[in-house]
C-alpha cells in the first residue's frame, strides 16, 4: 500500500530505508546479546570452578577470548555487508529514477548516474536540483570508494586509496589498520550513510514530483480552457445557417 501523497518510487525509497534501518539495529542487537550471554556464562563457569583462586578464575575467563573475538569479527563483517547493501540501495534507486521519470541517461559508469540525472533535469526544466553538496561529495567519493574496497579487497588507484583513508581517518565510527583495512566500529556510521543516501534520493524525487505536478496543473488548465470554449461557442447544428 502506497502512503498518501507518495509516488511509487518515493514509496520504494521509504520502504527500503525502513528495512535497512531495522537490519542495522537488529544485527547489532543480536551480536551484542550473544556477546553478553557469553561473558555471563564465562564468569559463571569461572566462579564455579575456581574455588576463589584468582589465577584459576582468570585462566578460565581467558579461555573464552576466542569466542568473544569470533563474535566481534562476525559483527564487523556484518557491518561491511550492510554498508554494501546500503550503497546498493542508493544505486538501485538512482536507476529506478531513470526508468520511472524516463530520463535520458548518458552515464557510462555507475558513479556518473546522479550527475546524468541532475544534468537531464536542468536541460528539461531549466533549473538545478539543489542537493546538499556534502552529501553528494560523500556519496560519489568517500562512500563509493569504501564500498569498492569492501567489494574488491583493494583499490586499483593509489590516489583513491589515499583519498579514502584520509576521509576514514577523520570520520567517526571508522577505524583504520595499516594501508588496506578499514573497520566500521559502530552503527552510527551506517545510519549516517543511510540517511545521506536517502536525503539525496528524496531531494531528486521531490524535484521531479514538483515539476510533474506543475505539468499536471497546466494540463488541467488547458482542459478547462477547451471545455469553456466549447460551452461558450457550441458547434452549429447540421442544417442551420
Language model: regions and residue ranges:
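Extended intrinsically disordered or low-complexity regions, especially N/C-terminal cytosolic tails and loops
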Residues: 1-84, 134-138, 162-241
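Flexible secondary-structure boundary motifs
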Residues: 80, 84, 88-187, 191-195, ...
Amino acid at each position: 500500500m502506497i502512503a498518501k501523497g507518495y509516488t511509487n518510487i518515493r514509496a520504494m525509497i521509504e520502504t527500503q530505508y525502513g528495512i535497512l534501518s531495522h537490519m542495522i539495529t537488529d544485527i547489532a542487537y543480536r551480536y551484542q546479546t550473544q556477546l553478553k550471554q557469553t561473558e555471563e556464562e564465562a564468569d559463571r563457569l569461572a566462579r564455579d570452578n575456581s574455588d576463589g583462586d584468582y589465577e584459576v578464575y582468570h585462566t578460565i575467563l581467558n579461555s573464552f577470548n576466542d569466542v568473544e573475538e569470533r563474535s566481534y569479527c562476525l559483527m564487523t563483517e556484518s557491518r561491511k555487508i550492510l554498508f554494501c547493501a546500503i550503497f546498493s540501495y542508493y544505486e538501485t534507486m538512482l536507476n529506478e529514477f531513470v526508468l520511472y521519470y524516463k530520463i535520458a541517461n548518458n552515464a557510462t559508469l555507475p558513479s556518473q548516474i546522479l550527475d546524468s540525472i541532475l544534468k537531464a533535469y536542468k536541460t528539461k526544466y531549466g533549473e538545478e536540483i539543489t542537493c546538499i553538496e556534502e552529501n553528494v561529495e560523500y556519496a560519489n567519493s568517500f562512500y563509493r570508494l569504501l564500498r569498492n574496497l569492501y567489494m574488491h579487497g583493494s583499490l586499483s588507484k593509489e590516489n583513491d586509496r589515499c583519498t579514502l583513508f584520509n576521509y576514514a581517518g577523520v570520520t567517526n565510527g571508522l577505524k583504520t589498520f595499516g594501508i588496506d583495512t578499514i573497520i566500521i566500529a559502530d552503527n552510527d556510521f551506517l545510519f549516517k550513510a543511510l540517511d545521506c543516501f536517502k536525503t539525496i534520493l528524496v531531494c531528486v524525487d521531490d524535484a521531479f514530483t514538483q515539476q510533474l505536478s506543475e505539468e499536471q496543473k497546466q494540463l488541467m488548465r488547458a482542459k478547462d480552457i477547451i471545455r469553456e470554449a466549447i460551452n461558450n461557442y457550441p458547434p452549429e447544428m447540421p442544417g442551420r445557417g
